[in-house]
């Protein structure tokens, strides 16, 4: 639709991603911290490994394909669908920031589609027993959600929209916090990471004093799906606009480079998590979505797995990948 001139307001994509990650956080919150403590080292190592693999792949393409550093950084940020990485690359590129935008636009569509297809197809190819894997994931996350006494608590509304609104406000505030990094860049969780962290925290504590903050799960699932639809519509229109023209003008080889930058870190991350870290398949896939900073893939994985528990692995790996990709983007621009 984007290729044929259909436009979507930019705020629709932003609203969609905020609704999606806030709802996911609230649903996954009760089990998140146990899973995080149990697999903390694995998630940190995996998030770092995925982005470094992408960086090394990009460096190789720069050397072998004689690709400009700013263009390569744009391709990598698109391949990893990383807006913070894209912003860091533009800042480092200075006057060449338009070249970064070209690379981002070429690699972004496959960056979204590639990870989504991977998490959908791999369980089917491996003939994974989802019921068995869900049981493993539930056991890893603490067997059962925390049990809370709700008697005597004040429910502000029956649907739990107040906790969702509180999560969104708190999440946006968290997302605005900027932490300085070497090279003059800044790290922030943004509209995707901030509401997710806020949702996990509020989903974990469940109440503040006498006020009940436990949302109705069915409502959160509805908001999660609605948010994902909005986000994908916005991302699709944005990615499709000018994609074909840019591809024809710049040459299909850049699209191939973008595909490689998506596939290599994704496959390396999957194999590393499976062979070295020995993570179960759903932990592996959830952490892979976080390491690839792919929110659409998380939505797809939740559908495939039939459980929101995979969001714990995503949320644990995502911040590590976010910081690393910002640093790697700067290095690529400066070195090549």
What spans do the regions from the language model cover?
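Structural signature of multi-pass alpha-helical membrane transport proteins
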Residues: 1-10, 19, 150, 161-219
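Transmembrane helix-loop junctions at the membrane interface of multipass transporters and ion channels
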Residues: 3, 7, 31-32, 64-66, ...
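Cytoplasmic-side transmembrane-helix entry/capping segments in multi-pass membrane proteins
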Residues: 12-20, 38-50, 72-77, 190, ...
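Entry/N-cap segments of selected transmembrane alpha helices
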Residues: 30-58, 108, 241-267, 318-319
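Intrinsically disordered, low-complexity non-transmembrane regions of multi-pass membrane transporters
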Residues: 123-164, 210-211
